[in-house]
Structures are given as C-alpha cells and as structure tokens.
Amino acid sequence: MNLALFDLDNTLLDGDAETLWFEYLHQAGHLEGNFFGKLEEFTNDYDQEELDFSEYLNFILLPLKKWGPEKVKPWREQFLLEKIEPRLRYQNILHDHRRQGHVLVLITASHDFLAEPIGQMLEMDFTLSTRPEIIDGIYTGKVHEACFRKGKVEILNEFLDIQGFKPNKTWFYSDSQNDLPLMRNCDHPVAVHPDQNLRI
C-alpha cells in the first residue's frame, strides 16, 4: 500500500484553522477581549521555530475549557460551513491519490475537535491530530499527544504499527519548516506554498 499524508494549515486549507476558529467565535459574539495580539505572538514564535506548544494549546483551548464541547459543537458546525469549506483547496491532488488507491491521511498540529470534522469534509481515510487531555469530559488545557514537529513522526509511526500498515511509498504535502522531521522521513516530500525557511 502507498500512503499520502497532508498537512492542513496553509496547505490544504488557505489559512490556519485555529486562528479562523477564534476569529469566528469573536465575530459571532462568543468571545470578547483582545486575543489577536496573543495569537500573533504565537504565530511569530511558530514561524521562528520557537513555539511553546503546550502554552499555545492551553490558550487555543479556551473556548472548550470555558463552555465544554457539547455547547460548542453547534458553533463548530456553522464555522466549518462558513470559514473552512470555502477555503479548502487542492482537491485535485486528493482525487489523484485517491484514484490510485493510496491511503489518505490528514496529519495536523490542530487539535482533534477541529481536525476530525475537517478530515471528514476532505474524505480522508484517517486523521491524525493533536489530542488534548480530557478528564471527566472536561478539557484540562494540557496535551495528551502533540502532533507537532517530531511528534508528527512519532504519532505516524504509532498509527502505522496499530494499523499494521507497511507503506511501499509515502508522500507528504506541507508548507512549513516545522514539518521537516516528517518530510525527511517520506519518499516524496512536497512543499506547498512553502514558508521562507522551507523555501531555502
């Protein structure tokens, strides 16, 4: 079998899912206050490969910690329709891999509350994402598994072992230097809208 891996943010999605989520919640009146400055700080840290992922995740999970997933799910459905679906791209590449019988996997640092339904929209065979810690149905703000940098490699290897997959060839599409650990472990790494450092 052959494996086609896809990053989400700024690759299959024109934008960053978690930033778009916060913008949507703010526009819908669910979030108040100036959080854009903090998001910009995290974005700059990400671009410089200096992101404290635990701190970032604790911040990005604020809506789920505040209201809980059941209250937020209806907002998520509207968000997906309004902000995500119009920004999805490269369906032709997905179609080409699917036509060849490749197993399609979305592998993203975005947390699973957003990543899972986006993977379904894209008709992915599997979605691998960051798994926040949940205790008694409550998001703690901590991470169970971070699908970020070398964590993507570890999570992918764990997934392959569980599924019993031994791919003959692997493709990986990404925009970010932070995905270099996984790109170096694939037969066919493909830079899509590469950031400055990945372009170099």
PLM feature spans:
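Amphipathic alpha-helical interaction elements
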Residues: L13, Q27, Q48, L61-K65, ...
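Metal-dependent phosphoesterase signature
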Residues: E55-R89
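Amphipathic alpha-helical segments within well-ordered protein domains
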Residues: F22-E23, L61, E77, D187
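Short, compositionally biased "basic patch" segments
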Residues: T43-G68, F126-T127, R131
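Active-site neighborhood of HAD-like aspartate-dependent phosphohydrolases
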Residues: M1-Q48
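Residue-level signal for pocket-adjacent positions within structured domains
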Residues: D7-L8, F59, T127, I138
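C-terminal cap/substrate-recognition subdomain and adjoining C-terminal extension
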Residues: M1, P74, L81-I200
